[in-house]
Amino acid sequence: MRAALWTLGLGPLLLNLWAVPIGGPGALRLAYRHSTCDGVVLVRHHGAWGYVCNQEWTLAEASVVCRQLGCGPAVGAPKYVPLPGEMAQPWLHNVSCRGNESSLWECSLGSWCQSPCPHAWVVVALCSNGTFRELRLVKGRSPCAGLPEIRNVNGVDRLCVLHVEEAMVFCRELGCGPVLQAPRRDVGVVRKYLACRGTEPTIRSCRLDNNFRSGCDLRLDAEVVCSGHTEARLVGGEHPCAGRLEVTWGTVCDAALDLATAHVVCRELQCGAVVSTPEGARFGRGSGPVWTEAFRCAGNESLLFHCPRGRGSQCGHGHDAGLRCSEFRMVNGSSSCEGRVEFQVQGSWAPLCATHWDIADATVLCHQLNCGNAVAAPGGGHFGDGDAAIWPDAFHCEGTESYLWNCPVSTLGAPACAPGNTASAVCSGLAHALRLREGQSRCDGRVEVSLDGVWGRVLDDAWDLRGAGVVCRQLGCRGAQQAYDAPAPSRGSVQVALSRVRCLGTETRLTQCNVSATLQEPAGTSRDAGVVCSGEVGTASPMARRHGIPGALTLSLHREPQGAAGRGAGALHGGAWGTVCDDAWDLRDAHVVCRQLGCGRALSALGAAHFGAGAGRIWLDELGCQGHESALWQCPSAGWGRHDWRHKEDAGVFCSESVALRLRGGTCCCAGWLDVFYNGTWGAMCSNALKDLSLSIICKQLGCGVWGVGLAGEQALPLCGHRDRLGGQHRVPQAAQLHSVAMPFPPMAPALLRPSRAGLSEDRPQAAGEPLNCSSWLGCPEEGALRVRGGEDRCSGRVELWHAGSWGTVCDDGWDLADAEVVCRQLGCGRAVAALGAAAFGPGSGPVWLDEVGCRGSEASLWGCPAERWGRGDRAHEEDAGVRCWEPGPGPPLPAAPFRTFWVVSVVLGSLLGLLLLGLMAFLILPRVTQAMQRGLGRSEVSPGEAIYDVIGEMPPAGLYEEIMEAEAVLQDEEDGSVVKVDTEAAVSGEVSNLLEGQSIRAEGGHSRPVSQGYDEAAFPLEEMTL
């Protein structure tokens, strides 16, 4: 009957009718993912669950599944590769839905059978109520570049080893245009987390390979860059915040760069505010493509990527746009060229202390901000106090530097700034500033002019007295006495700005003359224009008078070139620095100098050029201070410039706040143990305080470059790097530029100096092997210390960092297994098991110190990873990041906490059960073996010491089996002559047992022995005996 129905073709029909289930929620579920609302589609049939096998699976079918399960709309319909331990049997084949059905059973269902299903046809549904949250590229310079990942509620799936097909779908779904860069196919492993054809509308429709979910090698991560990515940089400037503007990586036409766009670029590069936008390829001609689109920024965007674009203009590289930004600014004045001096610290503006601020520092700042020359440097909060805390950094400029960060900066030993004592500057406001170099005063020397903030030479061709007169007038000096040809500086050290200058003599500025602007030095020998003015105008400038500033008189202490712990007194008068003669120089004069400079009290007054002979003018002689004056020029003296001595008698002073540095015990002059001279004594410095900004300042102050590496403990040897290693950059490096010592700007605090043991001095240097252990002395964690809290042990919990005197947390934005790997390594806790977010170990307290951490996984510490600036976290503590590490030990790594107790109990119970089974087997088998051995006594023809070697599992030797089976074994007891009959099958069992043990036992003396009462005469068939 069955065969007949099958022959008629009714068999499959009846089978399908019999297999159709009664539809219902209990017959459908999603499995093998993070929640019940996303995962593999499973259906139940005859009490067993199986896959749905579809060659074509779209959002229409996935939408029906999500609707039936009450999980919201479908957001993805990918394919799936099962894990090795997951079920592999399919039940339902070829489902087709329109998308509006209320349950899967209303769709067109194919066959119900267990026919083989290709792995690529196993289907998945991702619903909106599931754990999937967002798709993004992280750790790049814009949302259209970075490492691809899928962020879920319970963590992040890093999508490593993707190729161009997957990158195409990624870029398309993010709205970032076509893919520009993707990992090569010959890089990394063959298998991938997901596989796309490149035509899918969403990455959720690509095929998932769940075998590879936890096998991502973070070292093989490669960045995906889409065409929508825009990244700005400045090239060819004198510091990292100035140069030719290039955007990924083409130049921009100068006509297309407006002030709003410039503000966004400066903000993106963390370079403060816009100073100027020089045109005409001021920073050199670029190469490669030129942007034909123009950025239409509003000015408040955080990235250039967010600015809309419009139609731009066509230009060549002769019109490449330039941009100059500055981390310094002047505020609260009548213009941007006067006001309170502020600079950017950790994204905020802070005023600078006026204690050490002088006209030389103001000169550099005015030039840096393209504001001409400095007119005055008033202190005492002349332009208001501001709302932020006053920053105590002290700049020691000569006045000729092109950028304020090029000046020596000191922070060690700086006393707290008095409230309201903020630094200020008043600049001339001329965009084209002028100065005279290498002369005896500010009114004679070689002419240099600043065009758009860049100092340049003025060549001597066509130079005459009329041009010199214009220069003297512009500088506020008296009439020109001489126009001469000055020796040019070394070729290439200063670029040429003007040539063929022809003036009428009536102009107010040199740039109003008939000039030729050029950046090229002509071939052959060229000399510069020089001028000598008849003298300085004795009155203050109009701008200085407007602000009630009596004049530009400044005092400073100049170090000798070797960096000894002391200062020579010097004064700035009439724009030129000069020294003080030691005639009648005593401690009362020194007290006035130390008080005026905010350096405490005078420890000693030194003469005879103790700190080396100075240069330039000798301004003061025969000083007669009483010690209570507020400024040195209030003391009686012989008058300005009146003296009868040379620089071999320059005066010097030691103040109680004097700080000097030296390196000793190293292999070169720029490596060694760091000693600090403070309050008249040499002492060691704790390595706790050696962060990258301090190291940079130390190396610059010692003339050893602009960056350093500090090694703590017994290897605390700061190693300084010279400028040529950083491509000529002179500023303090930012965290994103030097990852090897990448720490944010630390908060300013009194220097952590430890007094030397038994008065450390130059005569008794500390041994190079002595460690500087300051932990007990400091009584607080080291800056940047790391810990975990709220976990089960010391290797799991919420990640916390010590910074600025308090513990803070890390935001889980961008937090993944690579970041956790660095934390676990830094804690000495082995490998990372999980990177957790959403305050998995409870919310922390205090500030959120780090956000968007971007570790690669190979860094030695968390502060070596790129991240948002310290304290810039934009989340509350409900998104605190955590880690779970596996500390290497005798056992395998433990899983997450919810499963740990289960596995421990399972192992213990399994071990007890195994021991119980072994004991039971011994109890049952051992008596039988013993009795069988007793029964077989006397049957062997070999001695006890001989062994019978045979192959286990083969039959007994020929004849033995038949001999035993033909007759009963008879054992004669010599004492009573009784005969005992033995079951032949039991005897066979005993003989075989003896043979399997490799020996035969002979009965001794031929005596019969009684049979044990425990023998049950059970036979063991040969075919069932196995080892």
Swiss-Prot record:
<keyword id="KW-0391">Immunity</keyword>
<protein>
    <recommendedName>
        <fullName>Scavenger receptor cysteine-rich domain-containing protein SCART1</fullName>
    </recommendedName>
</protein>
<feature type="domain" description="SRCR 4">
    <location>
        <begin position="328"/>
        <end position="428"/>
    </location>
</feature>
<feature type="topological domain" description="Cytoplasmic">
    <location>
        <begin position="928"/>
        <end position="1027"/>
    </location>
</feature>
<feature type="disulfide bond">
    <location>
        <begin position="97"/>
        <end position="107"/>
    </location>
</feature>
<dbReference type="GO" id="GO:0005737">
    <property type="term" value="C:cytoplasm"/>
</dbReference>
<feature type="disulfide bond">
    <location>
        <begin position="472"/>
        <end position="533"/>
    </location>
</feature>
<dbReference type="GO" id="GO:0005886">
    <property type="term" value="C:plasma membrane"/>
</dbReference>
<keyword id="KW-0472">Membrane</keyword>
<feature type="signal peptide">
    <location>
        <begin position="1"/>
        <end position="19"/>
    </location>
</feature>
<feature type="disulfide bond">
    <location>
        <begin position="196"/>
        <end position="206"/>
    </location>
</feature>
<feature type="domain" description="SRCR 6">
    <location>
        <begin position="555"/>
        <end position="656"/>
    </location>
</feature>
<feature type="domain" description="SRCR 3">
    <location>
        <begin position="232"/>
        <end position="326"/>
    </location>
</feature>
<dbReference type="Pfam" id="PF00530">
    <property type="entry name" value="SRCR"/>
</dbReference>
<feature type="disulfide bond">
    <location>
        <begin position="160"/>
        <end position="216"/>
    </location>
</feature>
<feature type="disulfide bond">
    <location>
        <begin position="625"/>
        <end position="635"/>
    </location>
</feature>
<feature type="disulfide bond">
    <location>
        <begin position="353"/>
        <end position="417"/>
    </location>
</feature>
<dbReference type="GO" id="GO:0002456">
    <property type="term" value="P:T cell mediated immunity"/>
</dbReference>
<feature type="disulfide bond">
    <location>
        <begin position="253"/>
        <end position="315"/>
    </location>
</feature>
<feature type="disulfide bond">
    <location>
        <begin position="855"/>
        <end position="865"/>
    </location>
</feature>
<feature type="domain" description="SRCR 7">
    <location>
        <begin position="661"/>
        <end position="761"/>
    </location>
</feature>
<feature type="disulfide bond">
    <location>
        <begin position="503"/>
        <end position="513"/>
    </location>
</feature>
<keyword id="KW-0732">Signal</keyword>
<feature type="disulfide bond">
    <location>
        <begin position="366"/>
        <end position="427"/>
    </location>
</feature>
<dbReference type="GO" id="GO:0005903">
    <property type="term" value="C:brush border"/>
</dbReference>
<feature type="disulfide bond">
    <location>
        <begin position="66"/>
        <end position="127"/>
    </location>
</feature>
<feature type="disulfide bond">
    <location>
        <begin position="266"/>
        <end position="325"/>
    </location>
</feature>
<feature type="glycosylation site" description="N-linked (GlcNAc...) asparagine">
    <location>
        <position position="332"/>
    </location>
</feature>
<feature type="disulfide bond">
    <location>
        <begin position="53"/>
        <end position="117"/>
    </location>
</feature>
<comment type="function">
    <text>May play a role in the immune system, perhaps as a co-receptor on alphabeta and gammadelta T-cells.</text>
</comment>
<feature type="domain" description="SRCR 8">
    <location>
        <begin position="786"/>
        <end position="886"/>
    </location>
</feature>
<keyword id="KW-0812">Transmembrane</keyword>
<feature type="domain" description="SRCR 2">
    <location>
        <begin position="135"/>
        <end position="227"/>
    </location>
</feature>
<feature type="disulfide bond">
    <location>
        <begin position="297"/>
        <end position="307"/>
    </location>
</feature>
<feature type="glycosylation site" description="N-linked (GlcNAc...) asparagine">
    <location>
        <position position="94"/>
    </location>
</feature>
<dbReference type="InterPro" id="IPR001190">
    <property type="entry name" value="SRCR"/>
</dbReference>
<feature type="disulfide bond">
    <location>
        <begin position="171"/>
        <end position="226"/>
    </location>
</feature>
<feature type="transmembrane region" description="Helical">
    <location>
        <begin position="907"/>
        <end position="927"/>
    </location>
</feature>
<feature type="disulfide bond">
    <location>
        <begin position="397"/>
        <end position="407"/>
    </location>
</feature>
<keyword id="KW-0325">Glycoprotein</keyword>
<dbReference type="InterPro" id="IPR036772">
    <property type="entry name" value="SRCR-like_dom_sf"/>
</dbReference>
<feature type="domain" description="SRCR 5">
    <location>
        <begin position="434"/>
        <end position="534"/>
    </location>
</feature>
